Structure formats: C-alpha cells, structure tokens
Amino acid sequence: MEHHANIVPWQMLCERSGATLKVAPIDARGELDLEAFRALLSPRTRLAAFTQVSNALGTVLPVREMVAAAKGVGALTLIDGAQAVPHQRVDVQALRCDFYAFSGNKLYGPTGIGVLYGREALLREMPPWQGGGDMILTVSFAGSTWNELPWKFEAGTPNIAGAVGLGAAVDWLEALGIDAVHAHEQALLARATAQLRSIPGLRLIGDAAHKGAVISFVMDGVHPHDLGTILDAEGVAVRTGHHC
C-alpha cells in the first residue's frame, strides 16, 4: 500500500528515538481495514502517516476518516499525496491534515523537488532541520535567530531551476483541468481493467472499490521482468520489479 518513502524514514526514526512503528493491515482486495486502523490508535500515538492513493495498488484511502480518527486521540497526521495531487482535486483544508507532501516528478515536473504543506502553527513551533544561508534572521558567534516561514526551512541556495519547472508543470496541469484529467484516467482505468481481466493466466493485484488509475498484475509462469521486456518491444511502457 505505502511507498517506501513513507516506511523507511519512520523505521530510521524509530531506531533513533525508541518509538514504535505500527502498521494497519489491508485486506485481499487491497483496501485498508479502517476499524483495525482505529484500534491501533491511542493517546500515546504521536503521528499517523498514510498515503492518499497507493502508487502500487491504486487504492484510494479514506483519508478524511483516518485524519478524524487520529485527531480523536490527539495525534498529528501526515498524508503522502504524491500519487493523488496529479490525478484528482485535493483540498488540504477540507482534509484537515497537519502535513501533506508530494513530489515534483509525479506532477510531470523536475526531479529533486517537492512540496510540503504544514499547518502554520506547527511550522512555527518546529526548529529548522538544516542550517545555512537564508534560513537565518541574524547571525553572531554568540548565537543566531531564525528567519520567518517558509525561509526558516530553506537553508542555502534553493533548487531555483527545479522550482521554476515545477511551477510550469502546475500551470500546465491546471490548464488541462484536473477534473478532466481525473475523468479521462478513470475511463482508461475501466477499459484497461476489463481488457486485462479477459486475458487467461493474468491476475490483477488489488481490486479496491475506489481506485486511482494504477493497475498491478502478474502472469502465471512469466517473470515480471520478462513480461516487461516483451511489452517494451511492442511499445508498451510498464513498471516491473521492485517499486522504489
């Protein structure tokens, strides 16, 4: 369900801090067990981090309900929106999440740049994660003070070219119309799913009721890399093997 970017950092943090990482189960259809998720939450829960749309299964998670459940025990929430933002309308205010992150390359923009939304009150409380130029207000050998938001978190020379490219990608997507993009992709998803189901020996992975335009599948007796090579020779682009 989750991208490695929403697994590995928390494992590393738990190793450093002694925190415990808990994982909510999914069912055979690739859908989150929402009641099991709620059962994992307690007043000791500090952060609930989850994807909005799975990059591997296409499952669209019930993020509003998940945010509400986490807030009910006083936990902060972070949503990985990398697979959602380019394909559907997203309103972080309506979701009521504390943090929301997505990448530039999934938005058809440059690599090496992304976006992190955070509630202003939380960002003001947080210390800088990196030191350097621009993130300071004053500097002396006796001590330094930090700049205002968002510059407090932008140490050093930023990825200027990447930011310009990301802005152009956003403009292009907005010109297409995100609702039109979503409708077109859902039509393609329905057609592709129906066609794939008709192929003998092909098994779809994940059959959630609400899906983004992602389909994972395997073929009986055929290694995914071999299948990918054959499809590539026919001009069909697929992703095979280990996802990130």
Per-region residue spans from a language model:
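Pyridoxal 5′-phosphate
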Residues: 1-244
